Structures are given as structure tokens and as C-alpha cells.
A protein has these predicted regions:
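Domain-level signal for soluble alpha/beta catalytic cores
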Residues: 1-301
Length: 301
């Protein structure tokens, strides 16, 4: 199986990454207040029926979780030259997830999104583009650590790319610096409306593109008129911005729409975006219903 088709299941399900933070008490929480949140996130994803899970990304938002560990950054200020983290940032939680489930994705905040979430307070960097390239070099170390840990897929989150704010050519260089450093399949997640950037985005050398189609149904028409050239498509079909839980028939209809446009073999079924801001109950049932809807469509093929 090629890197693009790394999971041998039609309409396999996954997550974009983050899950609600559900803290637990007890002795363990004294040593690690978020250990229980990781356990809950992993258990809920498995219970919902997800095929490729994450560690839940419960230790911070997408900027703070990585920026807080990289030398050269204090808070949200870039104060010196960016260096790789002294130790792996997300590997411990990812390894825990792998003790519970065979297929786990590693997730890294993309260099451009990270750069635009930080303030430059040093003459070391003239602009966000220079910063993004040094962030990419530092994140290569994290990517390789996740690969060594045994993740099934490396996802790079670049929500900033749909906004028109980031330099897409530098973004490509930065993402590919990370993607080319590993041998495992790579995915890039970009949320929002991709109409103005899609032609540039599709030039990025990754194995999977992950977009939202529930909140941005126009993305379906945009993508249907373009050649994915053998890449897979993460098909966001659950709204991550509300606690209102879609029914199985509602989600099934969205997946069926995707299957009308694309070969089901290239689709990975997931929510539009992360679930961090949702209630635990809403997040769980959104994933549960999504998995059931994917199963129904799969059986009907």
C-alpha cells in the first residue's frame, strides 16, 4: 500500500485532534493534573469507534502547547533564535495512546500558524516568514520523535493558510521541511473556506489534505473540480463549533455527498476541526454518530 493509502479500510474515521479537557482527581493528578484528561480523551475516542485516534491534545491550545517548550520563545513573545525543544513535546501522551490503541496520529502545530500566533520581540527575525522557517526546523525534531514512537500518521495543523494572511510559498517550504523529514504518511489540516488558496495548497507535498465540509459546504464544489493526484482527503463532516449533536442520518447524508464527488477509498471521515471547546458529552456523541454514519455508508457501497 502506498503512503497515500496507509489504512486498509474504506471511509476510515479519525479526529482532527483536540478533545475537551476532563480533569480527574486522585493521587495521579497530584503528579500530573492532566493525566486523567489524556486517559479520558483516548478512552472516549476508542469508545466512539474512531479508527485513528489522537492523544486528545489536552495540554494547551495549539500555540501554547508547542511555543511553551521551544527555546527562543517566552509566553507568546519570540525573544531569541528558535531552537528545538530540549525533550519531545507530545510524545509521552502519544505513547500512552498507543498503549491503548494500535493506530494513533501524531500532531504538530504548523510553522506558519505558530509564527502568526506569536509576537516577534527580537531583531533576530525580520518577519513571520523567517520565523516560520526556523520554527519548521525546530519542529522537524518533534516530527522525527513522533515517527520513532510509531505513529501511523503525522498531521501538521495549518489553519492560518485559509485566511490569506500567511505567505503560501513560505508555508509550503516550511511544511515540506517537516513532511520530508519523516517516512510515514503526512497530513495537513486547513480549516475554513479554501476557495482563494486551494490551487496553492494542493501543491504542498503531503499525503492527505484535511478540510472542513460541514460548515463550509462550498469546499466540496471547490475540491470536486480539482485533481488530488493520488492524495487522500480528510473529509470534515461534523460541525466542531457547536454542542448540538448531529444525528446519524444527518452525518450519513454529508458523507454520501462526499462519496458522490470522490472515490470513497480516498476519504478519511472526521470532524471539521478540533473538539477542545465542546462539552465532553457533545464531543463523544458527535464522534460516535459520525462513526455509525460512516459504517452505514460503508456497508451500502
Amino acid at each position: 500500500m502506498s503512503k497515500a493509502y496507509f489504512i486498509n479500510k474504506v471511509l476510515a474515521t479519525t479526529v482532527v485532534g483536540s478533545y475537551p479537557v476532563v480533569k480527574a482527581g486522585g493521587l495521579k493528578s497530584l503528579f500530573d493534573p492532566l493525566a486523567g484528561a489524556v486517559e479520558t480523551a483516548v478512552a472516549d475516542q476508542i469508545g466512539a469507534g474512531i479508527d485513528i485516534i489522537s492523544d486528545g491534545q489536552v495540554r494547551g491550545d495549539m500555540i501554547g502547547a508547542f511555543a511553551g517548550k521551544l527555546p527562543g520563545i517566552k509566553g507568546q513573545e519570540v525573544v531569541g533564535k528558535i531552537q528545538p525543544a530540549a525533550s519531545a513535546i507530545s510524545v509521552a501522551d502519544t505513547k500512552y495512546a498507543m498503549t491503548k490503541f494500535p493506530k494513533v496520529k501524531g500532531i504538530i502545530t504548523g510553522p506558519s500558524s505558530l509564527a502568526h500566533g506569536l509576537h516577534i520581540s527580537t531583531p533576530m527575525y525580520r518577519n513571520k516568514e523567517e520565523l516560520a522557517l526556523d520554527l519548521a526546523a525546530a519542529l522537524v525534531v518533534e516530527a522525527r520523535s513522533l515517527e520513532a514512537a510509531g505513529v501511523a500518521l503525522l498531521q501538521i495543523d495549518e489553519p492560518i493558510l485559509s485566511t490569506g494572511i500567511a505567505d503560501l510559498a513560505i508555508g509550503k517550504q516550511a511544511v515540506e521541511m517537516i513532511a520530508s523529514s519523516v517516512r510515514i504518511p503526512t497530513c495537513m489540516h486547513v480549516c475554513g473556506n479554501i476557495g482563494n488558496v486551494i490551487d496553492e495548497i494542493l501543491k504542498y507535498n503531503v499525503n492527505v489534505f484535511d478540510f472542513e465540509f460541514s460548515k463550509n459546504q462550498a469546499n466540496l464544489d471547490i475540491l470536486s473540480r480539482r485533481d488530488l493526484t493520488g492524495r487522500m482527503l480528510g473529509y470534515g463532516c461534523v460541525d466542531s463549533t457547536t454542542d448540538e449533536v448531529e444525528t446519524v442520518p444527518e452525518i450519513r447524508k454529508r458523507i454520501e455527498k462526499g462519496v458522490e464527488y470522490f472515490d470513497p477509498k480516498i476519504l478519511l471521515i472526521d470532524p471539521d476541526c478540533g473538539m477542545r471547546m465542546r462539552t465532553r458529552e457533545a464531543a463523544y456523541w458527535k464522534l460516535k454518530n459520525m462513526c455509525e454514519a460512516a459504517k452505514e455508508v460503508r456497508l451500502a457501497l
